[in-house]
Amino acid sequence: MSSEQQKLRWGIAWIYSSSNNTIITITDLTGAETVARVSGGQVVRADKDKPSPWAAMQAAYKAAQLALARGINAVHIKVRGPGGYGMKVPGPGASAAIRALARSGLVIGRIEDVTPIPHDIIRPPSGRKGRRV
């Protein structure tokens, strides 16, 4: 099939990548209907391997196969880090997950960073005086 004959069904791939895990969720364009949700902890056995790029790649391949089976063949990617008082950059699995989604046969549209950035001061979870040990 040529590219003009192939009908693209778009979805959104939400990649949340922290220093502890990587979670990939594929939804429809509205974001209301979840098509696939896979995390790094579902594809590895040891807890220490959850944030690794390898686990993120395997999770992205699995999510892409589920999305292709349900008819979504093109995605816009939204990458998110912890944000707030946490890291402002995504974890180690984000770029590996994007690469795996591109290699799995999905058409990639936009890639954007949706990490929540504070516009004022955020009080840390330990409070004003800090953690007293």
UniProtKB/Swiss-Prot annotation:
GO CC terms, sorted: cytosolic small ribosomal subunit
Keyword Acetylation found: no
GO BP: translation
Domain of life: Archaea
Any one GO molecular function term: rRNA binding
Alphabetical UniProt keywords: Ribonucleoprotein, Ribosomal protein, RNA-binding, rRNA-binding
Keyword flag Kinase: no
Function in brief: Located on the platform of the 30S subunit.
Quaternary state and interactors: Part of the 30S ribosomal subunit.
Name of this protein: Small ribosomal subunit protein uS11
Lineage: Archaea, Thermoproteota, Thermoprotei, Thermoproteales, Thermoproteaceae
Gene designation: rps11
